[in-house]
A protein has these predicted regions:
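Iron-sulfur cluster-binding electron-transfer modules in prokaryotic oxidoreductases
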Residues: 1-246
């Protein structure tokens, strides 16, 4: 999704990791993790996409994604396709290398300070699936609190649904819009200037509904915010931190 609709998010993921001295590899033939097909019930297509993913990324590097939904797809849902198959060993090796960005920064790189500034009132939107399925904890909040100038508003342990859900937003468009409006109205009520989302899909969903309903608020991903906040870095490269971007 980032590649097709938000290429700047993929570029910003690169900037964030390079700022921390991480050497990166970008498999140019990569396509998708297969989540959209999986959620739509097209499991054969999702399995073929998964095979391509495993063959292209391998298991030698960390694989860092700006999306907990995609990371969960690879970490957990691929098990339905590749358990006890010819790709079983390759998948198991890769499984432990897959991380959502904030999880990677906090729990692998152990980032405890961020050299960036961004003056704004922001509300963080963490998808339910990121917490329930991927088991993301407070890593996004930890990162936001490191950025000078950020004022966090809204519930500090807030996790919700943006109403996207892949085909859900098409099949149940009215309900999807109402869910997004609830989140947008909460942010406006709390005085937020920005909604910071952990999923690119939620940025697209919330932006679309905000524009259609004349709601004046900016929406961006956590990845984009981290990159936007950067000013200077004296990070030193470590050969232990080699990743592939997915």
């Amino acid at each position: 999704m980032a590649d097709q609709f938000r290429p700047e998010t993929a570029q910003n993921l690169y900037k964030v990791l390079r700022h921390l001295g991480v050497e990166m590899h970008y498999p140019e033939q990569q396509t998708c993790c297969g989540l959209a097909a999986y959620n739509a019930g097209h499991w054969d297509e999702a399995r073929l996409t998964g095979e391509k993913f495993i063959n292209e990324f391998g298991s030698e590097r960390y694989i860092v994604m700006p999306s907990a939904a995609c990371a969960n797809m690879v970490r957990n849902n691929y098990n339905r396709f590749f358990y006890n198959t010819s790709l079983h060993l390759e998948y198991k090796k890769l499984q432990s290398k897959v991380f959502e960005l904030s999880d990677f920064l906090i729990n692998v790189l152990h980032v405890s300070a961020w050299k960036g500034k961004f003056k704004a009132k922001v509300m963080l939107h963490v998808e339910n699936s990121a917490i329930i399925d991927y088991h993301l904890k407070d890593e996004p909040f930890q990162l936001l609190k490191m950025i000078e100038g950020i004022i966090l508003v809204g519930p500090q342990q807030h996790n919700s649904d943006c109403g996207f859900g892949g085909v859900f937003s098409v099949m149940y468009s009215q309900l999807s819009t109402e869910i997004a409006l609830d989140e947008l109205n909460l942010a406006v009520t709390e005085g937020a200037e920005y909604i910071i989302a952990t999923e690119t899909s939620c940025v697209l969903q919330l932006e679309s509904v905000a524009i259609k309903n004349g709601i004046n608020i900016k929406i961006m991903t956590l990845t984009d915010l981290l990159a936007e906040s950067l000013r200077f870095s004296d990070a030193i490269f470590s050969e232990e931190n080699q990743v592939a971007i997915g």
